[in-house]
Amino acid sequence: MIPNSTTIILTLSLLIWLSPFISKLIRMPIPPVEIILGSLFAYFGFIYDNPYFDLVAQTGFLYLMFLAGMEVDLKQLINSPRVIIHKSLLFLFILSILAMISGWMFELNNIIIISMPLISVGLLATLSKTYDKNESWITLAFTAGILGEVLSITALTIFDAASKTGFNIHLLIEVGYLAGFIVSVFILYKLLKILFWWFPELKHSLMPRIDTANQDIRLAMALFFIFIAIMLSLKLELALGSFIAGMAISAFFHHQKALEEKMSSLGFGFLVPIFFIHVGSSFDIKSLLAEGVVSGALTITVIMITIRIIASFVLRGIYKSKDALLTAFALSMPLTLLIAVATIGDEAELITHLEYYQLVLASIFEVLISMSAIKILHRRYIAPSISQ
């Protein structure tokens, strides 16, 4: 055990336990509360650099992506009306164009412009936990979010490789690995679909309905770590592997209705809170006093949320306007990908320390604003119609 680990263990234990109570007290969603608490307790020295903490937090992030994958109904996604797929792709295209225009208007760093249209579905898992995952806006957010997530991780992989090797043959190899992996997963999905169609009892053998040995959890965790190992060996983004592992569970073992609840309880009760606390602890509160940090972060936040709201106008024809607006806010929280881009840019010296803190703070602001906006909009427009 690393010396002085007692303090951080006790602190994390208390924060995980107390976060829901504080959330209810100040009427703020739990993830932003955990981020703020992480930042405050790091400032006062109760949370500090610790390799175990970093490892568990990274696992928490990957597990969050795994849970997000489990929320995806792949069959429903594949069979989605073409209008939804087309408008989701149009939403992402408009988002990218608006990001470039905004970056040019405000004379932003190219790295910041790259980060603006990023989409991550990680926090959608927390939203589907809080609200009914069958609500139309969450379904729409997942459809557009999955497409955006794949494109964003592809862009992040290319950016990461380019920052290390430059634009050369090594970059093409990295992109080839990624393309090969995605194609292989698609082929494997088709083969397994045929296999389980011919031998349906095989699914029940792997995950029996009456299970006294927790085979469902064992298989789910095995897939989780197997996909992470594959991504590690290919040197690709781990989040994509964990997300696909979750989708595989949802696609082939949907008969196990209780599994999602079991996995979700472990994630949102332990691993995911540690990840959010770690995000908060990574931000130095002292940097708030530096000139340009808060104003720059607010500028980035406002631009990123605004361009998503504008782009969501193309989604209004699918459902109601309020669903499109809620979808825009739900996709305005690329927390982990934004921090990943900031970290890569800082390590490669492509952005200044000021811009690094702006991006990290903007990622936190986006979660605070978007989750609060969703809560207000849902209470005002969605909840009354559900109760009627």
Which sequence ranges carry the predicted segments?
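C-terminal ends of transmembrane helices
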Residues: L14-I26, M65-N79, G122-E135, L140, ...
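Structural signal for the N-terminal portions of transmembrane helices
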Residues: S5-L10, T59-G60, F142-E149, T165-F181, ...
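Short helical (or helix-break) motifs at transmembrane helix termini and adjacent helical loops
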Residues: M116-A141, G148-A155, I307-F313, P334-I344, ...
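Membrane-interface junctions of multi-pass transporters
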Residues: L25-I26, L40-V83, H204-L298
